[in-house]
């Protein structure tokens, strides 16, 4: 039987933005889509618009010394699969991308549940990920920054605010209380890969599906853990407008360029 992640990997949308020279470092931006772990309407193509906006910025700015590419990553959805398949698919496909495209520096952009998966990819250290240790070591030594757009970070807090959201959580998890680890349990500034990680948290005032409660939760957690972060709260549109907003695109790429130039 073929590895199902092979198929998912070949569905990955690739946006090659700049190519400076063979000896340049390769900087990759990987987008992880949302959709509450269940929605087939959200795909790796969600970020095509923002890729175009980022491309415009790159064309007008100095990226000498870097090849820059963008990738939209895919993962299997519930109810066909349950946790931890979503995150292990993301790990597998990210690892393949890094190896196949020789990515030296990586930034992750996650929207909604994609932000959840991005945070897990970069920081989660639960026992169920032990067999992915070698892949995670490479991934985490390559990631320099996380852009978390209107994300979900605590299922317990989410269900307190939106009890009806159990309709999709129950499809994604057999028992979320046992299976979903709150980031307060694993975010630790003393871990080397977190020391070197830049956090960019973005949220829209106009988000009709998530209030600021999730963002506030993560912000307060990072403060308590003394982990530095950047926060942008503005009118970036409704929930599914955020990942196509041109101001968000500029925020992402200008922050990346400021780190490499």
Curated annotation (Swiss-Prot):
EC numbers on record: 3.5.1.9
Known pathway: Amino-acid degradation; L-tryptophan degradation via kynurenine pathway; L-kynurenine from L-tryptophan: step 2/2
Pfam families: BD-FAE (PF20434)
Keyword Hydrolase part of the UniProt annotation: yes
Highest taxon listed in the record's lineage: Eukaryota
Keywords: Hydrolase, Tryptophan catabolism
Keyword match Repeat: no
Subunit structure: Homodimer.
PANTHER family (UniProt xref): AB HYDROLASE SUPERFAMILY PROTEIN C4A8.06C, KYNURENINE FORMAMIDASE
Listed name of the protein: Kynurenine formamidase
Organism: Vanderwaltozyma polyspora (strain ATCC 22028 / DSM 70294 / BCRC 21397 / CBS 2163 / NBRC 10782 / NRRL Y-8283 / UCD 57-17)
The gene coding this protein: BNA7
